[in-house]
Amino acid sequence: MKRQRTIMGMPVTINVTDKNAVDEAINEVFSYFHYIDKKFSTYKTDSEISLINRGELPKENRSLEMRKILRLCEETKKETHGYFDINIKGIIDPSGLVKGYAIFEGTKILKRKGYKNFYVEIAGDIQAEGLNEEGKKWKVGIQNPFNLKEIIKIINLTNKGVATSGTYLRGKHINNPKKNAEADEIISITVIGPNVYEADRFATAAFAMGKKGINFIEGLKGFEGYMVKKDKSAVSTSGFSRYTN
């Protein structure tokens, strides 16, 4: 059962291949994504994050979800030596982590319903669980950032998450906090991890690091990466090819 919506201004796809799949469970995940969008969208003037940025919401009045996300952002900043930083010129923007977090939390809803085979995707960031309709691993294409209609790599996933960071993507403006400027050394980096939340936050940080970001991913246990540079050349971590065979 495959369903698609537009949420957060992005395409959202949920595909459950278990035979007992029902719309009610999938709609619950969509509702959760709407809830996250209302809290964290920097485009909505009445979102919780917008209220915070305008100084209209004191810390003591922040929701538990907001407090959790901001805490996770601070932890990620420390883990990435400051390259993951949600403070951009005085504005708080946790979008480099929220999408992956939302997808991962959404998959927990499906798991609680007893589903084991599904994928959940928001604009290319995916959590893939179990197997597809053919009983095989899920196939995920990596777009060519120079030609979005072209797939340059196909990876095979089960019980993994994948996320891509790149300034060619909608709404992506990743800052290099070390230079206090927009990160522009590379075009994109795709990260495979144990779940999409982890992949998303580290992909954001690795992109901000520029060319050395692939070395950062190489050093993370359980993660692999694929980087496309400005000259259209690509480099990957040592274990990335395991997912392309």
Regions found by a protein language model. Give the residues of each.
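Mature catalytic core of soluble alpha/beta enzymes
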Residues: 1-245
